[in-house]
């Protein structure tokens, strides 16, 4: 039973949704992905980001081929040395069954995306004990297929068939042990909160009927709310956040195999950068652009024959340095917050000197374009 007719694709919607959930509360610096597969979600978390300030990632899966693919996906590459992170990142990939996984310390977040429907009853109980009894994360996110949505994939013309009778042939994947409807999923989640009263749960999801490429015709028969989300998500929050801690195995005799450890390079500098550091980076980006595209005019400026006004796309500055991206904090309005003098200036101009005796006489920010006027002073 396919789910490929969503736009954006369902797996993309799911990763975005999980990431957005992690943004919404206590800073997530350590995370365990249970049933990590080939590390698609872990890979999504690798780029340095202040919104989810990850420093430690761990993934566990029972399938060795999946862990091999995850290892390849998460390997440090040449570009990781060229675009250094501004905080450390350590990754551990583990091979084994969560039933044997009993000696793990606290992590800030646990994600189990499209995992629980592959579990037998004993594994579900082990999952509950591991996560809520031992790890006690500040947030745990569990996603699983919503069985009620399956009738859409069956393409029944009347959309009135009953889904109360279930067999594995009605499931989305032959390896699924079960698929819950919304009431069953909620019943399971509330039972966890009753057993572990420090947790509360809320429900969300991704993949609505109107996200289907051909879903408009179906909406004439039933509203999107009739079936809910294609992927249903439970978000468990702990009422009292624990201090951040890296996760590691305490029991060296555990049958869980530490398959791979990966450490990413990073720049050991304090952040955010100072205003002077930030301006130096901006000037470097400006001059790199000038020497690359306006070399002749720049020499005329040096000779005192003319002034030079250049429109510099914001994207060029953005891509010139990860430090600049960090300083801008994913929004060029931060530029002004770093430079309060720009707010006071009628023309939003600033005079800056550098070691080449150039002076950036004026910087105007209009529609994500920087207009820079250069003069040369002896």
From Swiss-Prot:
Coiled coil: none
Positions that bind Mg(2+): 114, 117-118, 176
Subcellular location: Cytoplasm
EC numbers for this chain: 2.1.1.386
Protein name (record): Small RNA 2'-O-methyltransferase
Cofactor(s) listed in the protein's UniProt record: Mg(2+)
Entry function: Methyltransferase that adds a 2'-O-methyl group at the 3'-end of small RNAs.
């Amino acid at each position: 039973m396919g789910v490929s007719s969503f736009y954006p694709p369902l797996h993309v919607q799911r990763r975005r949704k999980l990431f957005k959930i992690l943004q919404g509360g206590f800073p997530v610096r350590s995370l365990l992905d249970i049933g990590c597969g080939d590390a698609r979600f872990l890979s999504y978390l690798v780029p340095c980001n202040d919104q989810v300030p990850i420093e430690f990632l761990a993934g566990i899966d029972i399938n060795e081929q999946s862990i091999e693919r995850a290892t390849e996906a998460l390997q440090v590459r040449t570009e990781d040395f060229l675009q250094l992170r501004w905080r450390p990142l350590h990754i551990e990939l583990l091979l084994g069954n969560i039933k044997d996984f009993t000696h793990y310390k606290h992590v800030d977040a646990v994600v189990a995306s499209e995992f629980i429907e592959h579990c037998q009853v004993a594994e579900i109980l082990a999952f509950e004990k591991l996560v809520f009894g031992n790890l006690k994360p500040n947030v745990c996110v569990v996603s699983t297929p919503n069985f009620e949505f399956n009738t859409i994939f069956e393409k029944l013309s009347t959309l009135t068939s009953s889904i109360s009778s279930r067999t594995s042939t009605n499931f989305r994947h032959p390896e699924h042990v079960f698929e819950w409807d919304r009431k069953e999923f909620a019943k399971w989640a509330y039972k966890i909160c009753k057993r572990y009263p420090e947790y509360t749960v809320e429900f969300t999801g991704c993949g609505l009927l109107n996200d289907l490429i051909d879903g408009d015709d179906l909406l004439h028969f039933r509203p999107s709310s009739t079936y809910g989300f294609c992927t249903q998500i439970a978000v468990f929050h702990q009422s009292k956040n624990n201090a951040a801690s890296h996760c590691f195995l305490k029991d060296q005799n555990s049958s869980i195999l530490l398959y791979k450890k990966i450490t990413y390079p990073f720049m050991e500098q304090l952040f955010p950068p100072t205003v002077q550091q930030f301006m130096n980076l901006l000037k470097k980006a400006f001059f790199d652009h000038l020497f690359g595209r306006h070399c002749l005019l720049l020499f005329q400026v040096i000779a005192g024959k003319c002034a030079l006004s250049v429109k510099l796309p914001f994207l060029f500055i953005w891509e010139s340095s990860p430090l600049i991206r960090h300083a801008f904090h994913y929004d060029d309005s931060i530029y002004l917050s770093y430079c309060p003098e720009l707010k006071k200036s009628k023309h939003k101009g600033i005079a800056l000197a550098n070691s080449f005796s150039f002076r950036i006489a004026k910087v105007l920010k209009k529609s994500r374009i920087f207009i820079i006027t250069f003069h040369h002073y002896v």
